[in-house]
């Protein structure tokens, strides 16, 4: 069993935007052993800003690694897979926009070449990971037995776009932005970015119960997470999120209606990014999908409860129910 992150080389990788990543690579982490027929593979695409090791808490807390082989895959732009910080790609200003269809294709290549896989027991994702799970079900129905989409939607909503654009503007308004990158670390831009991010990621009840000033809380607990990233990578992932639409600009209801995977859609009661009504609408469009709400003051982070046993228990129950039933398609 591998417990360290690895990279899988993809060669020159064409993107839907028309550019090609030279010598592309995808980061991944394997927890648990694959069955000889690959029937126990669970793919976990990464969320915004996450390294694959950040999601390793799912083993044992949600999935039994003695039964399931959990493959956590890093999306392009996360700093470990091919990213602007490597010089591998540019930003939207130069016409570079990675779409989740590109991420799904790279993950499929990883699974084929590293694991000999032809099918996945489940694609499980939170936030941008949920977006990729939806994309898997739309693009690769023959591969995707089940999807569990936690705190994420099948298309970026207009209101969610405003949040993302405010984050992008916080970074590119910094005095060190030069139109294609940064001449120096955008310290003020990152501080503004962290304040905006925190105000949306956690809920109003969450901030009412903290025992320090909110600006100090953000400085201590939020800002360091974003400072570990090259800001160009943060922007690249924002652009992927902004471009997200499993229907590619077409009929979303029709695209979701064609999903054959057994599906669970999981909302957070206080999620300000992806409110329950938005997730319920996606679930209602997918044949046979189940809809769940985790009642939690963690806000959007209720779907990534790495240190919150109550929320972990909800996710463990939902995924166990999903995995207990074969896909009838």
Question: Predicted regions span which residues?
Answer:
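Conserved hydrolase catalytic core segment
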Residues: 118-161
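Short beta-strand/loop motif that positions the catalytic acidic residue
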Residues: 259, 265-267
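Catalytic active-site module of serine/aspartate enzymes centered on a nucleophile-bearing elbow/loop
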Residues: 280-281, 288-329
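Conserved alpha/beta-hydrolase "acid-adjacent" motif
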Residues: 272-278
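N-terminal cap/lid subdomain of alpha/beta-hydrolase-fold enzymes
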Residues: 27-87
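Catalytic-loop region of hydrolases
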Residues: 1-44, 329
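Alpha/beta-hydrolase-fold enzymes
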Residues: 143-224
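Conserved acidic catalytic loop of the alpha/beta-hydrolase fold
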Residues: 90, 101-122
């Amino acid at each position: 069993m591998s417990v360290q992150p690895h990279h899988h080389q993809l060669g020159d990788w064409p993107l839907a935007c028309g550019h090609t990543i030279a010598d592309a690579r995808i980061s991944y982490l394997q927890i648990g052993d694959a069955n000889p027929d690959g029937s126990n593979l669970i793919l976990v695409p990464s969320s915004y800003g996450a390294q694959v090791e950040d999601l390793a808490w799912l083993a044992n807390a949600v999935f039994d690694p003695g039964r399931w082989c959990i493959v956590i895959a890093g999306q392009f732009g996360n700093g470990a897979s091919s990213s602007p910080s490597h010089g591998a790609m540019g930003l939207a200003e130069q016409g570079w926009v990675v779409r989740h269809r590109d991420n799904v294709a790279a993950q499929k290549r990883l699974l084929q070449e590293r694991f000999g896989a032809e099918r996945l027991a489940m694609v499980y994702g939170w936030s941008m990971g949920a977006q990729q799970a939806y994309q898997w079900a739309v693009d690769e129905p023959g591969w995707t037995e089940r999807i569990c989409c936690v705190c994420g939607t099948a298309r970026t909503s207009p209101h969610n776009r405003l949040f993302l654009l405010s984050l992008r503007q916080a970074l590119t308004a910094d005095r060190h932005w030069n139109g294609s990158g940064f001449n120096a670390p955008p310290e003020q831009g990152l501080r503004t970015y962290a304040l905006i991010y925190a105000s949306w990621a956690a809920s109003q009840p969450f901030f009412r119960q903290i025992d320090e000033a909110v600006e100090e809380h953000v400085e201590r607990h939020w800002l360091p997470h974003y400072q570990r990233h090259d800001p160009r990578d943060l922007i690249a992932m924002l652009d992927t999120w902004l471009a997200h639409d499993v229907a590619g600009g077409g009929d979303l209801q029709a695209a979701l209606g064609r999903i054959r995977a057994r599906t669970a859609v999981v909302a957070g009661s206080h999620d300000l990014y992806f409110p329950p009504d938005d997730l319920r609408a996606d679930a209602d469009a997918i044949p046979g999908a189940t809809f769940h709400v985790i009642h939690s003051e963690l806000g959007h982070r209720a779907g990534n409860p790495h240190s919150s046993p109550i929320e972990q228990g909800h996710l463990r129950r939902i995924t166990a129910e999903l995995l207990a039933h074969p896909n009838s398609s």
